[in-house]
Every structure is written in structure tokens, then in C-alpha cells.
């Protein structure tokens, strides 16, 4: 049963990871292209367009999505996303300009150069769009790195657990064979068992803590469901009496 439940779980995690990789590549490519258009000089744009690896990855990803979904579907999706992103960026840009104007007036009233100090808040819609794309790409990449590190740590935990067991068995056999005195052998075996128990406790505390958290959350959900059922059951007799 555990294997049957764990296989779909791993497949779902793998599917999420693949989708997030595609989304991250798309966002990084879009943000890179937008930042080149917005912040780079024309000569630098020509040089970086041909040599940028993100541009090549973005083109390959676009060709792959065109093959999967079709060029017309991809065109509609990209146009819709661009319009939504531009509307959000324009609204944020207007808010930034309004905030910079208010801050400039307040700073000027204090005798400071408000226009110069608030120049960084005056962001155009294209600059806001670039920042949003890079921020979304950073969040997706952070999620991917967290997932990858969790998988690596889980694998290392399994490897260290097996290595710990092998070392314990080897130490146990060596003690039984090499120590002739029963009292000394018992003390050394007790020390070995204590060390093994401490290592098991230290290495298993994090995983057991996560399992306990999951169990507590499951119990909390069950309690909330029971409370909801009790409330609905208590309301039903009242409604019947009123009728």
C-alpha cells in the first residue's frame, strides 16, 4: 500500500518540477530579453542577442511549446499574458509615479532635493514588467532549489542510515571477536549501543518532527470537519422545529 501511494506522489512531484523548470526558463528568458531591451545600449543588444545562452534556451523552449500546443494557441496565450502583464505593470508604474511625486513634495518641504532623491521610484511600465518577471523567475527557481535540496537531503539521510547500520554491525562483530573478557565486552557493547542510539536520535529527529507536524495537521483538519458536522447537525433540528 505504501509503495502504491508513494509512486503517484513522486510522479506528481516530478511533474511539478518539470513544469516549474519550463516556467522558470520562460520567465528568465522573458526577463532577460526585456532587460536587454530596456537597460542595454543598442550596440550591446546586438552583441548579446547572438551570444546569450538564455536567448537560445528561450527560442528552443518556444519551438517546443509551438510543437506541443500549436503556433496559434501559443500566440493567443502569449498575447493574453503580455496584455495582462502590461496592464499590471502600467498600474504599478502609475502608483510609483504618484508615490514619487508625494515623496518629492515632502522632501522638498524639508529642504531636500526631492526630485533627485525620488528619481529611482519613477519606473516605466516596461521597467516594472522587467522587475516582475525577474521576481517571478526568482520565486520559481527558489521553489525548485528547495525541492532539489529536500530530495538530496532525503537521499543522503538514507545513505547515512545504511552506512551507520553497516558500521554498527562491523563494530559489533569486531567487539565480539576481539574482546575476550565478558565484562569489558559488555561495557564496550553498551557504549556502542548508546552511540548508535544517539546517532539515530539526532539524525531521525528532523524527519520525525516533520511526520509529527503532518499528523498534527491531519488531526486538526479532522477536528474541524467534526465541528462542522456537529454544527450542521445542531442546525437541522432547529430548522425542523421552526417549520
UniProtKB/Swiss-Prot annotation:
Q: What happens when the gene is disrupted?
A: Viable and normal in appearance.
Q: Where is the signal peptide?
A: 1-33
Stated membrane topology is: Multi-pass membrane protein
Q: Which reaction does it catalyse?
A: K(+)(in) = K(+)(out); Ca(2+)(in) = Ca(2+)(out)
Superkingdom of the organism of origin? Eukaryota
Q: Which UniProt keywords apply?
A: Endoplasmic reticulum, Ion channel, Ion transport, Membrane, Nucleus, Sarcoplasmic reticulum, Signal, Transmembrane, Transmembrane helix, Transport, Voltage-gated channel
Alphabetically, the GO molecular function entries are: voltage-gated monoatomic cation channel activity
Lumenal side of membrane: 34-83, 157-185
Q: Where in the cell is it found?
A: Nucleus outer membrane; Endoplasmic reticulum membrane; Sarcoplasmic reticulum membrane
Listed GO biological process terms: cellular response to gamma radiation; intrinsic apoptotic signaling pathway in response to DNA damage by p53 class mediator; negative regulation of programmed cell death
Annotated TM spans: 84-104, 136-156, 186-205
Report whether 4Fe-4S shows up as a keyword of the record: no
Cellular component per GO?
endoplasmic reticulum; monoatomic ion channel complex; nuclear membrane; nuclear outer membrane; sarcoplasmic reticulum membrane
Q: Which Pfam families match?
A: BRI3BP
- Provide the membrane-side ranges marked Cytoplasmic in the record: 105-135, 206-243
Quaternary state and partners of this protein?
Homooligomer. Interacts with CRYAB; in the cellular response to DNA damage.
Q: What does this protein do?
A: Functions as a voltage-gated monoatomic cation channel permeable to both potassium and calcium. Plays a role in the cellular response to DNA damage.
Can you say what this protein is called? Voltage-gated monoatomic cation channel TMEM109
The organism encoding this protein is Mus musculus (Mouse)
Amino acid at each position: 500500500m505504501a509503495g502504491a501511494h508513494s509512486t503517484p506522489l513522486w510522479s506528481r512531484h516530478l511533474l511539478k518540477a518539470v513544469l516549474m523548470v519550463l516556467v522558470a526558463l520562460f520567465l528568465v528568458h522573458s526577463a532577460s530579453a526585456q532587460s536587454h531591451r530596456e537597460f542595454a545600449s543598442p550596440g550591446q543588444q546586438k552583441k548579446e542577442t547572438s551570444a546569450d545562452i538564455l536567448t537560445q534556451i528561450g527560442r528552443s523552449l518556444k519551438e517546443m511549446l509551438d510543437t506541443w500546443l500549436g503556433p496559434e494557441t501559443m500566440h493567443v496565450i502569449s498575447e493574453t499574458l503580455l496584455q495582462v502583464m502590461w496592464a499590471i505593470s502600467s498600474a504599478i508604474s502609475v502608483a510609483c509615479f504618484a508615490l514619487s511625486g508625494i515623496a518629492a513634495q515632502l522632501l522638498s518641504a524639508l529642504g531636500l532635493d526631492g526630485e533627485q532623491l525620488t528619481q529611482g521610484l519613477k519606473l516605466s511600465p516596461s521597467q516594472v514588467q522587467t522587475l516582475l518577471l525577474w521576481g517571478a523567475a526568482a520565486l520559481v527557481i527558489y521553489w525548485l532549489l528547495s525541492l532539489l535540496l529536500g530530495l538530496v537531503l532525503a537521499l543522503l539521510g538514507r545513505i547515512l542510515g545504511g552506512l551507520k547500520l553497516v558500521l554498527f554491525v562491523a563494530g559489533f562483530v569486531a567487539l565480539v571477536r576481539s574482546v575476550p573478557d565478558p565484562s569489558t565486552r559488555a561495557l564496550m557493547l553498551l557504549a556502542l549501543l548508546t552511540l548508535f542510539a544517539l546517532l539515530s536520535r539526532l539524525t531521525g529527529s528532523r524527519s520525525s518532527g516533520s511526520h509529527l507536524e503532518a499528523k498534527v495537521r491531519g488531526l486538526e483538519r479532522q477536528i474541524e470537519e467534526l465541528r462542522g458536522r456537529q454544527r450542521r447537525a445542531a442546525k437541522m433540528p432547529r430548522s425542523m422545529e421552526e417549520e
